[in-house]
Amino acid sequence: MEAVILFPAIDLKNGQCVRLEQGDMARATVFNLDPAAQARSFQDQGFEYLHVVDLDGAFAGKPQNAQAVEAMLKTVTMPVQLGGGIRDMATLQAWLDKGIARVIIGTAAVRDPAFVKEAAKKHPGRVAVGLDARDGKVAVEGWAETSTVTALEIAQRFEDAGVAAIIFTDIARDGLLKGLNLDATIALADAISIPVIASGGLASIDDVKALLTPRAKKLEGAISGRALYDGRIDPAEALALIKAARAA
């Protein structure tokens, strides 16, 4: 089957590696004071691609944890995708120039779709769109506001734009270890041609196994945060399952 990627997540707040519950900045748990060391740990465990979010940047609308991100880029060799506060071409270009493999555009995908299309055209394969849904509607501004449009409506705007991936997060499950909302994620993936990455709620090895079933074949992979930090998913077991599925 196609290669499924399990992305370990590092969320940055005040230069530290944290996890939030349902995107609430007041419900943050610090997991590592040194994000670069956490990134190195994930690489040493065998992960192939790192997912990083500048939480402060998502709220501020511009990068707030650049120092921590740059330290990670100097520490690991695996590709890094980054979201949070990327709302104009200058910011996007600066991150790509610094070595970010793929940038994730969230709020601006709702507010300024022309920017996403221009960026994807200019940087093929390096621009992803992050769609974070609350009750089916896309949330913006670090999830502080909910728009009136659905994830599918937004995704369809970019069907022919060259967007590398859609990262779909179910806010209701994020950080709560309730399991992925695979039904909604697969429904989105089946309705568009852009690869979709599942996010929010991945809780156990069973969620990883579900990603490897035929019905999830259009998913590029999934992002895991709290389940890895809490030890609910054994990296070696998860990566071995994925490796076996690739060879099948």
From Swiss-Prot:
Which CDD domains does this one have?
HisA
Q: Which EC numbers characterise this protein's activity in its record? A: 5.3.1.16
GO cellular component, alphabetical, reads: cytoplasm
The pathway that the record names for this protein is:
Amino-acid biosynthesis; L-histidine biosynthesis; L-histidine from 5-phospho-alpha-D-ribose 1-diphosphate: step 4/9
Q: Give the keywords, sorted.
A: Amino-acid biosynthesis, Cytoplasm, Histidine biosynthesis, Isomerase
Pfam families with a match to the protein in the record: His_biosynth (PF00977)
Q: Which reaction does it catalyse?
A: 1-(5-phospho-beta-D-ribosyl)-5-[(5-phospho-beta-D-ribosylamino)methylideneamino]imidazole-4-carboxamide = 5-[(5-phospho-1-deoxy-D-ribulos-1-ylimino)methylamino]-1-(5-phospho-beta-D-ribosyl)imidazole-4-carboxamide
Where, subcellularly, is it found?
Answer: Cytoplasm
- Report if keyword Amino-acid biosynthesis is assigned: yes
Main localization is: cytoplasm
User: Could you give a GO molecular-function term held by this entry?
Assistant: 1-(5-phosphoribosyl)-5-[(5-phosphoribosylamino)methylideneamino]imidazole-4-carboxamide isomerase activity
> In its UniProt record, which GO terms are filed under biological process?
L-histidine biosynthetic process; L-tryptophan biosynthetic process
| Matches recorded under InterPro entries | Aldolase_TIM (IPR013785), His_biosynth (IPR006062), HisA_bact_arch (IPR006063), Isoase_HisA-like (IPR044524), Isoase_HisA-like_bact (IPR023016), RibuloseP-bd_barrel (IPR011060)
List the active site.
11 (proton acceptor), 132 (proton donor)
Gene3D superfamilies documented for this protein: Aldolase class I (3.20.20.70)
For this protein, the record's HAMAP family field holds: HisA (MF_01014)
Q: Which family does it belong to?
A: Belongs to the HisA/HisF family.
* Protein's name in the database: 1-(5-phosphoribosyl)-5-[(5-phosphoribosylamino)methylideneamino] imidazole-4-carboxamide isomerase
Organism, scientific name: Afipia carboxidovorans (strain ATCC 49405 / DSM 1227 / KCTC 32145 / OM5)
